[in-house]
């Protein structure tokens, strides 16, 4: 009896050990890299202000109303701050953590439908995707959004392959509605366009109306509304201008116009998608062709008795990925992370058909090594040419990245290694190598974070020192200072908040008058603006400067 219990414990530990090792690799540099402008600073600061004010309904950025995105990530990060305090890792924990959870999500779904070997192949594919690894390690909304949306879509497919009328169908469908609500609270109503568009298109292609009859809309919509609606209702009641800005400006106007100034050609996402799937491009192409021509697999259950067609999960995932690509390619606003939700489902598709984790992992590890070497060397050459020197830290991170990639590549030649070990080494090599490249990038000038600038200025500040941001707003200054700034002659993404509270605006002339009267103050200037006003005789002493900001003291 005791021996049996011991064996079970060892087996349980063996099952969890790979995930523990992957997690250690995944979170290795979460605290090492400084927050980067602009997004990481923004999504670190808004939760800090929520926690400081106690207002978890109306998001504020630099103490101005900020309604571009829903609050789920703000809430989660504020909880992290309340428990552990502000730091790089607490600001990134939610987004980076849920990006990591995508690995477990894909594994669980593929294993349930297609077996353990396919599941391991899918994890290998996702774990070596350069695009997924880079975006997944940044404090953006896209990592968490990708998890919730992917979970909703995969839960929907599990409901559709369950026996009609079974408890599993209802359970998975309600889970899909709840997960979709969390996706809406992560990034907005685009969830309906992507998931709903995929459902409509799939139905038209398959001529399968049975899918619609199994949505459990009454209970599902009720659950969805219970989770998603309260915040939208409360924020609208407190801020009557919210609905027009959020639903119209941030969704319809963003898609139909170029007002957000993120104009890119229609093919913008194609090379990014190639970067995402490059290590497993050939298996994916074969899986895509197979999913379209013969999308059913023996391990997939289920059509309703007498139905002319059955639900085909892999074909649905393929349609869903295509909807994401086409929708964002047609949009007037394009940013690289928008297509991140494609990557987990494409990895699941590749894994379901290839069913050879060791082969995929070996190929990916060998292909990644030269790419990492070129990238590491390219960053060093860039620094040498632009800055006339290469920081010591850049050399260190470059060597670490190359070492991680080479170790994984060399290990791939061990033909007798178990598939799990082969996948684990390849994934850890890729995860670490791309993180180390990100670290190399951050230490090469110009500074892409205000962390060092703030550290140089902090000794000259007191809790009551007036702070100004003149001609610019650098997003990482506020979270590292733990303070908000008075904007001077600048609007940018804070224009809506300034329109809501016009008394918060300050012209450069008003600033100059107040600055001259101050006995103690610090201003963060755009370098060009500082040069102009210094020549005009504006008093001040430069405390610190980098390529983007000049910190000036009134003293």
State the predicted function of each range.
Residues 2-8, 170, 174, 287-555:
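Membrane-embedded architecture of ER/inner-membrane glycosylation machinery
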């Amino acid at each position: 009896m005791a021996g049996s219990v011991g064996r079970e414990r060892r087996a349980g530990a063996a099952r969890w050990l790979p995930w523990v090792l992957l997690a250690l690799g995944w979170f290795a540099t979460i605290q090492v890299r400084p927050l980067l402008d602009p997004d990481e600073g923004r999504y670190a600061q808004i939760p800090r202000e929520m926690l400081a004010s106690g207002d978890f309904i109306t998001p504020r950025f630099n103490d101005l109303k900020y309604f571009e995105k829903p609050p789920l990530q703000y809430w989660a990060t504020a909880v992290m701050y309340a428990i552990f305090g502000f730091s790089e890792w607490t600001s990134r924990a939610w987004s980076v953590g849920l990006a990591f959870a995508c690995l477990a999500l894909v594994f669980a779904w593929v294993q349930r439908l297609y077996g353990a070997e396919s599941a391991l192949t899918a994890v290998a594919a996702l774990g070596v995707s350069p695009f997924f690894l880079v975006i997944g390690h940044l404090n953006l909304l896209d990592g968490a959004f990708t998890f919730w949306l992917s979970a909703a879509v995969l839960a929907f497919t599990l409901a559709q392959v369950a026996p009609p009328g079974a408890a599993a169908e209802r359970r998975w469908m309600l889970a899909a509605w709840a997960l979709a609500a969390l996706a809406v609270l992560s990034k907005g109503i685009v969830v309906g366009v992507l998931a709903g568009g995929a459902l409509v298109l799939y139905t038209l292609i398959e001529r399968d109306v049975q899918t619609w009859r199994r949505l459990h809309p009454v209970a599902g919509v009720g659950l969805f509304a219970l989770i998603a609606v309260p915040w939208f209702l409360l924020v609208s009641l407190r801020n009557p201008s919210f609905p027009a800005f959020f639903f119209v400006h941030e969704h319809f106007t963003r898609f139909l116009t170029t007002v957000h100034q993120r104009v890119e050609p229609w093919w913008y996402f194609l090379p990014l998608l190639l970067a995402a799937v490059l290590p497993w491009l050939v298996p994916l192409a074969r899986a895509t062709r197979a999913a379209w021509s013969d999308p059913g697999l023996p391990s997939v259950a289920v059509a309703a008795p007498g139905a002319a067609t059955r639900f085909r999960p892999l074909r649905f995932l393929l349609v869903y990925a295509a909807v994401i690509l086409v929708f964002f390619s047609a949009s007037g606003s394009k940013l690289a992370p928008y297509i991140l939700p494609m990557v987990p489902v494409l990895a699941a598709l590749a894994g379901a058909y290839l069913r050879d984790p060791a082969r995929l992992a070996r190929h990916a590890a060998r292909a990644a090594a030269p790419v990492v070497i070129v990238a590491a060397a390219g960053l060093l050459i860039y620094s040498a040419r632009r800055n006339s020197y290469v920081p010591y830290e850049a050399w260190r991170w470059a060597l670490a990245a190359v070492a991680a990639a080479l170790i994984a590549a060399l290990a791939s030649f061990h033909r007798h290694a178990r598939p799990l070990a082969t996948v684990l080494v390849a994934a850890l090599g890729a995860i670490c190598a791309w993180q180390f490249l990100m670290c190399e990038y951050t230490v090469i000038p110009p500074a892409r974070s205000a962390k060092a600038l703030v550290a140089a200025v902090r000794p000259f500040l007191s809790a009551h020192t007036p702070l100004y941001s003149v001609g610019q707003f650098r997003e990482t200054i506020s979270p590292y200072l733990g303070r908000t700034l008075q904007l001077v002659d600048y609007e940018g993404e804070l224009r809506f908040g300034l329109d809501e509270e016009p008394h918060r605006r300050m012209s450069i002339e008003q600033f100059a008058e107040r600055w001259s009267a101050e006995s103690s103050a610090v201003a963060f200037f755009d370098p060009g603006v500082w040069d102009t006003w210094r020549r005009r005789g504006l008093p001040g002493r430069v405390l610190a400067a980098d390529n983007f900001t000049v910190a000036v003291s009134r003293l």
